[in-house]
UniProtKB/Swiss-Prot annotation:
Its main location: membrane. Keywords: Cell outer membrane, Ion transport, Membrane, Porin, Signal, Transmembrane, Transmembrane beta strand, Transport. The keyword Transport applies. GO terms for molecular function: porin activity. Homotrimer. This is Outer membrane protein P2. The keyword Manganese does not apply. It is a multi-pass membrane protein. It comes from Haemophilus influenzae.
């Protein structure tokens, strides 16, 4: 019998968990180990005002390892600990194959009840993480974290509907600071322990998603405050730390699943407003003070997409995005992007795919020539789960 699209989607997102090895199961305690190794070979090029750069690579594409321990107390109560590491190369001196080091992606504890929901504390995903419906393996054209943060140091509550409310998920998160000024010599020796300038100070978000009866609908709202780099950190704006103060954003999705056809169509969208605070700098000769006024940046996007079961164990997916960014001082950016991919399961623990993306950006600023940028990427990837 032909698989339903719902089963395929659930399988795709939960593959690592479904294939995890149970290493201990006794008296209500369950411990699982799992993860995946992911490799991609790709060709990418970018063009800015007719200046082209091109490169090919064979690299890591999100390899990870996790351990999860669950303790059931009875009467539906449980506690859980989760740790997930990633292989990354986001720091200087790392390898070009992106296997430069190991970092902690998620680390949290959970206390919950099947009927009343769960409370999660630590570095974890937020309710905004699963709001949009677009599928991608590597070159996702949606950048949700510019609208609402999708993970961080958080205290969160999640409720999953039961007894007639299957498919409903409600959530709320409070985000705490995660980056602080270290001790010892540095740029801010007298600010040890304070939130680092232009890093998250705190934030809050709420959201809801419904996925049942062939209908997908979701919305999330978030407000994130950033530590301002005021005069106590950078009196003359000599370090160029940035001026971001607050981001308010909304993400939403609406989709319908044609089960008989194995087709899901969806429409994702988002809106965000970023506030930048006033700063003062000294002129080059030091004789006068220059005030840089506060300003707002607004961005929005719409993205129709689809996922289609071409044949058993083979899926086709894609989406288009139009995004616009405007600043009340006159700078405007428009981006059009498209993504298309095909994936195929060679085995329940082996997935291969080919995916490509193309994006074109136009930037206009007062008194300046329009700038055009293009980016193209195509890759063939392989994931082996364990």
């Amino acid at each position: 019998m032909k698989k339903t699209l719902a089963a395929l989607i659930v399988g795709a997102f939960a593959a690592s968990a479904a294939n995890a090895a149970v290493v201990y199961n006794n008296e209500g305690t369950n411990v699982e180990l799992g993860g995946r190794l992911s490799i991609i070979t790709e060709q990418s090029n970018s063009t800015v005002d007719d200046q082209e750069q091109q490169h090919g690579a064979l690299r890591n594409a999100g390899s990870r390892f996790h351990i999860k321990a669950t303790h059931n107390f009875g009467d539906g109560f449980y506690a859980q600990g989760y740790l997930e590491t990633r292989l990354v190369s986001d720091y200087p001196g790392s390898s070009s194959d992106h296997f430069g080091g190991i970092t902690t992606k998620y680390a949290y504890v959970t206390l919950g009840n099947k009927a009343f929901g769960e409370v999660k504390l630590g570095r974890a995903k937020t309710i905004a993480d699963g709001i949009t419906s677009a599928e991608d393996k590597e070159y996702g054209v949606l950048n949700n974290k510019k609208y609402i943060l999708t993970n961080g140091n958080t205290v969160g509550y999640t409720y999953k509907g039961i007894d007639g409310l299957d498919g409903l998920v409600l959530g709320a998160n409070y985000l705490l600071a995660q980056s602080r000024v270290p001790g010892g010599p540095g740029l801010f020796p007298r600010k040890q322990g304070e939130v680092y300038p232009q890093q998250i100070s705190n934030g809050v978000q709420v959201g809801a998603k419904y996925d049942a009866n062939n209908i997908i609908a979701g919305i999330a709202f978030g407000r994130t405050n950033y530590k301002t780099a005021g005069a106590d950190f950078d009196f003359s704006d000599a370090f160029g730390l940035g001026r971001k103060e607050q981001v308010e954003g909304v993400l939403s999705t609406l989709g319908y699943r044609f089960s008989d056809l194995g087709l899901l169509v969806s429409l994702d969208s988002g809106y965000a407003k970023t506030k930048y605070h006033t700063t003062t700098t000294d002129s080059d000769d030091g004789r006068q003070t220059i005030t840089n006024p506060a300003y707002d940046e607004k961005r929005s996007f719409v993205s129709p997409g689809f996922q289609y079961e071409l044949m058993e164990d083979t899926n086709v997916y894609g989406n288009f995005k139009y995004e616009r960014t405007s600043v009340n001082q006159g700078k405007n950016t428009r981006e059009q992007a498209v993504l298309f991919g095909v994936d195929h399961k060679l085995h329940k623990q082996v997935l291969t795919y080919i995916e490509g993306a193309y994006a074109r950006t136009k930037t206009n600023d007062k008194g300046k020539t329009e700038k055009t940028g293009k980016e193209k990427s195509v890759g063939v990837g392989l994931r082996v789960y364990f």
